[in-house]
Each structure stands twice: as structure tokens, then as C-alpha cells.
């Protein structure tokens, strides 16, 4: 009887230990599973999300131009240090980097039909003479887009004849351009109306950004392509 009781006791203990082992294993699996879910939820999202890159328009302007228009961006010079910059249809026509700018009025001539560059030049209207500038203005072909930007001083030697010829290109502000003013303009030879593309900042010692010069004036837009003869 004692032996049978001992056997029963051993069997009971073994069953208890087996049951405890099974329960502990199941609990441990669930615990690891729950911890895995927790860490999975808290882990940072490492999936790369595609970013939308802002579109770049021609000449870096802020909008796309309609069909049959040329994008342009133009900036005057900064004091007598940084030259002006003229861009048309994503082509830099004049800039300090291109080394084709100078003191006075900087001018780029562009074919009104194709947008192709015709000529770039500048005329020193502080230390030079206005005569060559007037002759240049006279010879601009009809249908030509004319882009102008001042650098340092573009007004001292301007006379009434030169101002009149620039006004005929569509300028409304050339009559008030004065010593060291900053001015940018886009017009055309043979234009019938005043151009909407013109900006002017007056040289004023109380508001000048640089000592003796106003801040840079910039302008951008879309020039209609010339269609008809």
C-alpha cells in the first residue's frame, strides 16, 4: 500500500510539473508575441516616402509661360559691384559671369519670332558719350525684343533724343530715369502700346540699400512671340 501510494504521489507530482511547464511555455510565447507587436508599433517608419519636387520653370521664374511666349527674368546691377543679369527662354544672355556687362545701360536684342539672340551690348552713359547709343537704337530692326538693365549709372549722359527713342520701344519711365537709379525694361521695336514690363527704383539717400545706390530691381514674365509680319 505504501508503495502504491508513493507511486501515485510521484505520478501526481510529475503531472503537476508537466502542466506547469506547458502553461509557462504558452504564456512565454504570448508574452513575446505581445512585446513584438508593441515594438513593431513603436518602431519608426523607415519607409521612404516620395517627395514632390517643386517644378522649375524657364529662367527660374515663378510660373509656366503660355504657348507662343518667351520666359524672361532680368535684374539690374547692384551698386557698382555686381553686374546685371538678363535671361530669356532659359538662356543667360548677359551677366557678370559671362563678362559681357558694363557700366551704363546694358541691352540684349532678341528675335521676336524665334527668341534667338541677336546682340548684346552696353553703353557707358556716365563716362562715355550718348551718340553711339543713339546710333545703336536707330538700327534696331522692327520686331526685335529689347531688354535693358542699368548698372552703376545709366542716366547721366542720356539726352532727350535717346530718351525719346527708348520711349518708342514702349518705355513709360525712361523720362524720369536719373543718376544712379536702378531700372529694368523689356520692350520691342515697332511696339504700338506701352510695355507692361518695366520697373524703376529711384536713387534716394534716405532709402538706398547700398551706400549711394538703391537696391537691385528684378522683374520676370512672359513675352508674347511675334506672329505677324
Swiss-Prot record:
Domain GG-type lectin, first and last residues per copy: 68-226
Annotated compartments: Secreted
GO-annotated molecular function: carbohydrate binding
Signal peptide residues on this chain, from the entry's feature table: 1-24
GO CC, alphabetical: extracellular region
InterPro entries: FAM3, ILEI/PANDER_dom, ILEI_FAM3C
Disulfide bond entries: 59-87, 65-222
Keywords assigned: Developmental protein, Disulfide bond, Lectin, Secreted, Signal
Role this protein plays: Involved in retinal laminar formation.
Family assignment from sequence similarity: Belongs to the FAM3 family.
Protein name from the UniProt record: Protein FAM3C
Species the sequence originates in: Xenopus tropicalis (Western clawed frog)
Lineage, broadest ranks: Eukaryota, Metazoa, Chordata, Craniata, Vertebrata
